[in-house]
Amino acid sequence: MERMALYLVAALLIGFPGSSHGALYTLITPAVLRTDTEEQILVEAHGDSTPKQLDIFVHDFPRKQKTLFQTRVDMNPAGGMLVTPTIEIPAKEVSTDSRQNQYVVVQVTGPQVRLEKVVLLSYQSSFLFIQTDKGIYTPGSPVLYRVFSMDHNTSKMNKTVIVEFQTPEGILVSSNSVDLNFFWPYNLPDLVSLGTWRIVAKYEHSPENYTAYFDVRKYVLPSFEVRLQPSEKFFYIDGNENFHVSITARYLYGEEVEGVAFVLFGVKIDDAKKSIPDSLTRIPIIDGDGKATLKRDTFRSRFPNLNELVGHTLYASVTVMTESGSDMVVTEQSGIHIVASPYQIHFTKTPKYFKPGMPYELTVYVTNPDGSPAAHVPVVSEAFHSMGTTLSDGTAKLILNIPLNAQSLPITVRTNHGDLPRERQATKSMTAIAYQTQGGSGNYLHVAITSTEIKPGDNLPVNFNVKGNANSLKQIKYFTYLILNKGKIFKVGRQPRRDGQNLVTMNLHITPDLIPSFRFVAYYQVGNNEIVADSVWVDVKDTCMGTLVVKGDNLIQMPGAAMKIKLEGDPGARVGLVAVDKAVYVLNDKYKISQAKIWDTIEKSDFGCTAGSGQNNLGVFEDAGLALTTSTNLNTKQRSAAKCPQPANRRRRSSVLLLDSNASKAAEFQDQDLRKCCEDVMHENPMGYTCEKRAKYIQEGDACKAAFLECCRYIKGVRDENQRESELFLARDDNEDGFIADSDIISRSDFPKSWLWLTKDLTEEPNSQGISSKTMSFYLRDSITTWVVLAVSFTPTKGICVAEPYEIRVMKVFFIDLQMPYSVVKNEQVEIRAILHNYVNEDIYVRVELLYNPAFCSASTKGQRYRQQFPIKALSSRAVPFVIVPLEQGLHDVEIKASVQEALWSDGVRKKLKVVPEGVQKSIVTIVKLDPRAKGVGGTQLEVIKARKLDDRVPDTEIETKIIIQGDPVAQIIENSIDGSKLNHLIITPSGCGEQNMIRMAAPVIATYYLDTTEQWETLGINRRTEAVNQIVTGYAQQMVYKKADHSYAAFTNRASSSWLTAYVVKVFAMAAKMVAGISHEIICGGVRWLILNRQQPDGAFKENAPVLSGTMQGGIQGAEEEVYLTAFILVALLESKTICNDYVNSLDSSIKKATNYLLKKYEKLQRPYTTALTAYALAAADQLNDDRVLMAASTGRDHWEEYNAHTHNIEGTSYALLALLKMKKFDQTGPIVRWLTDQNFYGETYGQTQATVMAFQALAEYEIQMPTHKDLNLDITIELPDREVPIRYRINYENALLARTVETKLNQDITVTASGDGKATMTILTFYNAQLQEKANVCNKFHLNVSVENIHLNAMGAKGALMLKICTRYLGEVDSTMTIIDISMLTGFLPDAEDLTRLSKGVDRYISRYEVDNNMAQKVAVIIYLNKVSHSEDECLHFKILKHFEVGFIQPGSVKVYSYYNLDEKCTKFYHPDKGTGLLNKICIGNVCRCAGETCSSLNHQERIDVPLQIEKACETNVDYVYKTKLLRIEEQDGNDIYVMDVLEVIKQGTDENPRAKTHQYISQRKCQEALNLKVNDDYLIWGSRSDLLPTKDKISYIITKNTWIERWPHEDECQEEEFQKLCDDFAQFSYTLTEFGCPT
């Protein structure tokens, strides 16, 4: 019997890879093969000169059931017995949905040749690069983009590309296939998530993707840029020199900025910034340049122990203001490392292995602390007497002579900088390991490339050095070499060697294809067994593979002028252009496309992981990114990841603080501490505290208090304050002499942030150098800036080329820079500034005018222009402020014109100002889960989203509701919950009797089945599968010993045949047949036939005549319902073998039907959960069960099937239940069950747990198969919106589930949503509206708080005004509060005075513990003040200045909140606001509807009477809307205006108001016009007004009294009897009668 088993094993193993004798056959492939990519492989025969045909196959792994590629090649002596066939693996033939790594089997067969290698698969078949027109956008703007697609040969790819847009929250909002020749822009919505967005591009049906980023912010472009250049890239703690930062400020049109910079240094420790307050300095910016200095003494005074800062970073925060104070740019230089040694040494470019007795090239990479290359730094390895100096890329090569017998080599390298002491030099050590020769042969190969800067066009010398015994060297006839580039085998060649040559040199021509780097791998063979190899990594200078240049005239251009640029590039190239305002790059230049970024991305496709060489011959191939196998069983390790572990990133070559002090007084104190107590007095106390009260805060002792009081009283007697005020004289002048007429000035109005988004093809005939050129003509836009023209070309054969940016400088000698905020609030007064620049070398006199726009209230009116005239000095600028109040929501023009007297210089600018509603934007979020199967009625779910109740909405503002629907794909639960690496114990060699052998065979069968299905072989080892298959083959052959002639089985052949064991053999063999070739269908189907003919009863049940000896192998059969169990178990075996035996067993279908009918009768009466689960699986597998109610009723907690004290049986039974539900497609029930199974951490045993082991892993494998393929998501959703006649319909399926669908409506009405179908989705309803600001009065608990502000005079550089903010608080408890926070929200346009806050936190009489300023430019500034305590007995007061940096009127209040750090419920909030009565434009508002009120008041018409015809003529002018006789009922006051409430007594001329007599009317006038009007209560008046003075609101019309309003007192009836009024009354009567009866004359 044993001989028969051995024979069968040998027969089955035929066809598995075997060794050939007499020659060495080699197969080399890339270690990672890419789909849809032509890959070159190498097959070589050494020691064989017989021509032969080789078949090359690529199969799927692990089962090799599918041939993915095949070809045939001829190997012959003429070709050196070396062939390099090209293979290509179609992506559509392999799984792209798997979460696990995918592998393929590369197989070479031929006469005497059989080679096979499992190789990792990658889906990165090509590259996608995304270019956007800019890196930052505002809400509502379009995102323009291009996608460039190329393969690894840099050739154009024409595959379908999908482009997706994702919000900062990761929500997919757009997904479309794109035409690579034309791209539609993506339009950002107005209501959009701010932050960093992603554009993801990927090929259709490919998991690989490429991402580009852009920011969405509310921003305005700066007018100048600031660049900072530190004197060193590090701060050396032991140095003696101060640290300097050079500041360069340039306007974006190229001219230098004159102004001032405020510089503050600090240290960033982890994520916390700790400033150095004493470093705050004011630096003049002269001719655009300035220099800030951090003195070491200042640094040490803040951080006495600099050693504690090593490893942290220094930063410099710089704020630059222009001379006029009109503009400000804030920037920061960070990442300046604080170091004990200024350099770092890396060995990332150094091979870790050496060859004893041969030179070792040690490449040292030296960087600055920020990671940038450190050039010109001497380095030395003293032990080897080798030294060198780094090149510009930071590298230096040291040649080390290695002893002959060295096995390891400790190497220490240090910098040798002359200015550093030895202990501060950078030092780095490594240990290199000797290359291990194969079998200790002592044969070596050393490949040396000594050139440093390598570029295309060079001829590179490559040296092959050999060392070994004489006999071996005689056998070397040639070297085989491979050149790898971008992860592919680029070239294969041979270099001959003559006898006696220890050094062979070849020249390698460097072509552009080898950019950005390549690997040179070489090897030779010794005999027919040994391979000796070496490799080296070579960097190539980054350039375009082709050519692209943008040329222009390099002249300064005028805005709007015509100009030309010339494109020069490769013939046939397609060039994409864009011109970007340089100001955009000041805000964000992170995402700009560049050639370096392209090469950095491409270089990541190099699958090599070291700088060259290797631990041994196999290590050389592995580290270079190659897979090798030979006929002598030399095999590289299995690669399990496409990417290498990443070492250190390779850097491609790529308020003024003014301190008043009285030094003489302080000098009286010799003691340094007491002197400081005196000096701290000199700082003015913002609170105005007396000297005695200030002394209470001193904690340094009585001596300090005494010194403080003495100095304080002295200073109080001598201090004086000088205040100066500066005014800007603005005049109105109607003099036109010498100025260009405004109508002749054409305003500039086109100010895009980017433009020239064009694509041009270079189709022109090339010149003698092979360069094609194209000249483009265009008109510049109106911006005065520098346009950066970016050009990116794509050539089918030379890939992508990014040209050097070409800059177009645009300016005028005299121009306006109109600076406006991103948006302003309706009815909120704001100042805009026009900066007039004079670049003429002489003084000029200028007139500037703000043009009238009815959408604004301003000094310019319809009838009177607002002009100012003033001089501007030569080569200087002047800021002119204009105050406006926007009255209407939307985009409105602001236009300024200016001209120079007696000159032809003029300019005009018209820009759009965005006006947003009042209030604060709020959102209400509602989330609805759509699950029609669970929540619907009759399969349809109906949801009605009720209209919102928005009681706090600002009247007449829009409501916007967004409905976002996103599918919920069914999640995979199992993932890697079952760790495949823990199945090692199941791969065993079967042995023993017929039962024991099957127990042991089932283990590798189920392990292989599970690991195949879940693709987890790499966790156990790819090579272990061959071992497992061999064990299965062994078990199969062993079981044949126990097979009887009738195909039944028993533990021994002399025992009676077992029904259960025979069914078990059928089941396990049927499963094994899926994984192992050679398992005969006769063997499987013979067992099926025996079971049907010999063991099935007439009623369909199966019986057992000979129970197995090993009862535990049967699992849960023990107990009641054994006949049902056996029938169900055998039925499962029949069903699982049906695909094999259906054509060979005629009675199989009828047998299955009989067994099924038997089980159906028993199923609902079963008592045991175990039997119920097994029977349910058998019936479901036979397609006879689709109702899960009985099955689920037998469960415990609906997630497992439990019987008392039977854990492994419970696992087995639960596994049957899971299989049953999967067969019934009840996928929604499976999740909890899978979780229960995986939570058991059950990895099985071979004895006592056989069935539980087999069934658990079979069920989990089936779940892995079923869940990704069923993709049970097919939802139809209908949305009925109030403003749409046609409902909106969406269909959500598995492929588009993650795409967020958004629909919007502006009507606040009910929305109806219906969903039907299968699956789930999430519906998010977002309602946005503007809510009225509400001050919650007296929001106080445990704190008293009083806040006030007062105007102060201050002459601060850059500040437009100042307020003193006074905060007084007291704790209302019985004792003082402990740590307390004061959170201050600043007024819009104001910043805190840093000097005041510093004084409050410093000095011996410090009032606050510390403070923080949150200066987020997109929001209001916040100041956080920390107090150690707040008194419960007296007020604690803080006074500090807040400085106005830009004008905002009608601003919203600021707030002050005080609260306990330890009890957030103890808090108090108060609001503060500057005086509203000063400097505000006149406007009249009813609710939120406002009108601009003119400067001139109307007055009561009574001085001179006009005759009736003239009066009728005036009343009938076209602009007059109404004529009434009214009675004044009362006078009210509102918001600083007078409200005259009148009753209409008579309608003389009908106006807009259809029924004016129905109710009283409000006539509104400015308070200042009260005296001029002099209206009296109960008097009657004739009144008319123009249509433009009506103020309609939702339910009424109010009337504004302006200079256009006619008001005349109408005498009472008794007064008309008097002679004085008779004529007037007659005229009024005639006037009224004429208009009433006859109307206005036509």
Curated annotation (Swiss-Prot):
Q: Known InterPro entries for this protein? A: A-macroglobulin_rcpt-bd, A-macroglobulin_rcpt-bd_sf, A2M/Complement_sys, A2M_N_BRD, Alpha-macroglob_thiol-ester_cl, Alpha-macroglobulin_TED, Anaphylatoxin/fibulin, Anaphylatoxin_comp_syst
User: GO molecular function: any one?
Assistant: toxin activity
Spell out the SMART domains in the cross-references. Answer: A2M, A2M_N_2, A2M_recep, ANATO, C345C, Thiol-ester_cl
**SUPFAM superfamilies, alphabetically?**
Alpha-macroglobulin receptor domain, Anaphylotoxins (complement system), Terpenoid cyclases/Protein prenyltransferases, TIMP-like
Task: Spell out the disulfide connections.
Answer: 544-801, 609-644, 677-704, 678-711, 691-712, 857-1492, 1340-1468, 1368-1437, 1485-1490, 1497-1569, 1516-1640, 1616-1625
Q: How is it modified after translation?
A: First processed by the removal of 4 Arg residues by furin-type protease, forming two chains, alpha and gamma/beta precursor, linked by a disulfide bond. Probably, the cobrin cleaves the C3a-like domain and then the C3d-like domain, generating the mature cobra venom factor (CVF). This mature CVF is composed of three chains: alpha, gamma and beta.
**Which parts of the chain are coiled coil?**
none
Give a brief account of the tissues where this protein occurs. Expressed by the venom gland.
The record lists glycosylation at 153, 158, 209, 1346
Question: Which one Pfam family would you cite for this protein?
Answer: A2M
Q: Where is the crosslink of kind Isoglutamyl cysteine thioester (Cys-Gln)?
A: 993-996
Cleavable signal peptide: 1-22
Region called Factor B binding site, residue ranges: 736-747
Q: Which residues form the propeptide?
A: 650-732, 985-1263
Q: Where does Mg(2+) bind?
A: 516, 539-540, 542
What are the boundaries of the region C3d-like domain?
Answer: 985-1263
Q: Which family does it belong to?
A: Belongs to the venom complement C3 homolog family.
Q: What does this protein do?
A: Complement-activating protein in cobra venom. It is a structural and functional analog of complement component C3b, the activated form of C3. It binds factor B (CFB), which is subsequently cleaved by factor D (CFD) to form the bimolecular complex CVF/Bb. CVF/Bb is a C3/C5 convertase that cleaves both complement components C3 and C5. Structurally, it resembles the C3b degradation product C3c, which is not able to form a C3/C5 convertase. Unlike C3b/Bb, CVF/Bb is a stable complex and completely resistant to the actions of complement regulatory factors H (CFH) and I (CFI).
Additional comment? CVF has been used to study the complement pathways and to investigate the role of complement in disease pathophysiology. It has also been used to consume complement to prevent the hyperactive rejection of organs in xenotransplantation and for targeted complement-mediated cell killing. CVF can be safely administered to laboratory animals for temporary depletion of complement activity. Interestingly, it is able to deplete complement in serum from all vertebrates tested, except cobras.
Oligomer and partners: Heterotrimer of alpha, beta and gamma chains; disulfide-linked. Is active with factor B in the presence of factor D.
What is the protein name for this chain?
Cobra venom factor
**What is the originating organism of this protein?**
Naja kaouthia
